[in-house]
């Protein structure tokens, strides 16, 4: 009974309520806004204290309500047609530019954003919409910290979302009137009849909706004098396209001091470059300065950093994310910390853009970053005569490589560092490439530069790209010219020399009275399972250092078990990284009829071997880095690398050296030096304890030599462990089960 009574009352009220003319209400609100400018004399009242925000809200609500009422027809309603035909958005854009009343620009940004997001009818194809959108974009993103930053970000977010849904809009928003002539025919063939009027430059076009009240039409046509006499800069872009206004606006917003707004702007650019349409992606790269602008901002951040940065300080910020680019507050402050964090964060962002972008955009952006940052900015610093410039730029490049993930940018980095020449290097070649200069820096007079450059190459070798290992090592090992012709293949070790018969090995023992820790027997033939051979090879490395020079046993920490388990994990990781490179399972067969040619290990291995040969005379930190790079190389599961670096029984061609033969010479030198150092064993044990932090680090005589001996012992154990997990050489991809603790 009550429900029936309520229904009757509602029906009675509805009968008395007059029907609302949406168009009339819409025009009345617009007239209210325009009359404010005619009648108001107060220039200081903020826009939010006038009735303008309320009237704009009513106009928006009318547009949304009208669209819901006409959802079945799919055509633009009278109010929307009125908005388009009378260039209301153009007029609002002009009012926003004038910033009168104060805060009007903020209201205009909000209205544009809400209309474009809440009205479902496609709008950005219309000239009377995308032209004011372009003009409004020019008003924002130019001054960091402006009062409208929040509204600008919301506005650009709506535009990027629309482009993501319809990539064809990209040309309208970025180029505008220039594109109209090219697309007019296609547009008119698909647009509804009532919509076509929206493209025409008429202030008062004829419309059935307006014909309901001729007085209303005439009255309105006299109202918007504001829109008839617009300033020249608000007219269509007659002098050329609006050059990437959305992009420049977004890049400006990325510089906002408000991290949330900057992050949202970066996410909007990410939406823009990941458009699915190949045509839109091509347009974005060829008809705009998008890629170059992003790369140029990266270079600006680089130039804003101090010229001199400590590599240790750079290392504290490695791995910084673009989503959290601010420097960690708990780290020690240093000059340029915030600038460095901003640079590394933007580089990570560029790398992420290239990863997520359409292939066309990714390639173009990668080339832009390579050209602007690598070639034009970093390369002069890397080749500079100033040691500080070399040191800082090398450390920064290492940090960039560590963050780099995108395949396209990785390819550009490889080409930048190593070039494209895949021919084996000759000893007489002049150092004409950047890569060759960097290799020479590994043997620089400055130990700091040598360490920093070795770290760079170690990072390079860990990237999932074959060009690094091929250019640095493999191309010089092809053909196995390091093996003496007529020598047996590596599967048979019967005729090889044992260590005491090696001419390199005996040099160090002449009249020394010292002997190696154990005498390895002549290498027997490899058994079917390879266990005999691996035992001999492992023992060859473990027995290199004489007992007088070993100290790890005195500290009850042999360390070999730990090396094996570490090597196993690193080898599995390396094997999975190179599995798809199609490497052979065994070494290339020797051609006995091929004339002998001189072998050159390549500049990279040459420098590393020269460095390891001076291990007893180099600083401890430098020795650690040299051995780290060599261990990283030895892990690669290529049969030629395995043979050249880890096979003690290889029969070397005349004049050639291998890693093992270099170590043998070092041991020979060590045995002669031991006799000249009083209380050698006691001092060596003390130095090891100092390095482990067990005793205070007081300075000792022959400290460099003693530290070098400790590194040498550990390096030999590490090589033995790597050989163990990699063997046999003819099947480096075999998956061995990890050895149990304590049973190695």
From Swiss-Prot:
Show the coiled coil region(s).
Answer: none
Stretch list, region Disordered: 184-213, 510-530
Q: Which residues cross the membrane?
A: none
Disruption of the gene: reported phenotype: Mutants are viable, fertile with no apparent defects. Mice are more susceptibility to colitis induced by dextran sodium sulfate (DSS) than wild type littermates. They display significantly increased tumor burden compared with WT mice assessed in colitis-associated colorectal cancer model induced by azoxymethane (AOM)-DSS.
Top-rank taxon, per record: Eukaryota
Q: Which Pfam families does the UniProt record give?
A: DUF5917 (PF19314), KELAA (PF19311), RAI16-like (PF10257)
Q: Where is it expressed, tissue-wise?
A: Expressed in colon.
Query: Which portions of the chain have biased composition (kind: Basic and acidic residues)?
Result: 197-213
* InterPro entries, alphabetized: FHIP, FHIP_C, FHIP_KELAA_motif
Q: Which family does it belong to?
A: Belongs to the FHIP family.
Q: What does this protein do?
A: Able to activate MAPK/ERK and TGFB signaling pathways. May regulate the activity of genes involved in intestinal barrier function and immunoprotective inflammation. May play a role in cell proliferation.
Supply the name of the protein. FHF complex subunit HOOK-interacting protein 2B
What organism is recorded for this protein? Answer: Mus musculus (Mouse)
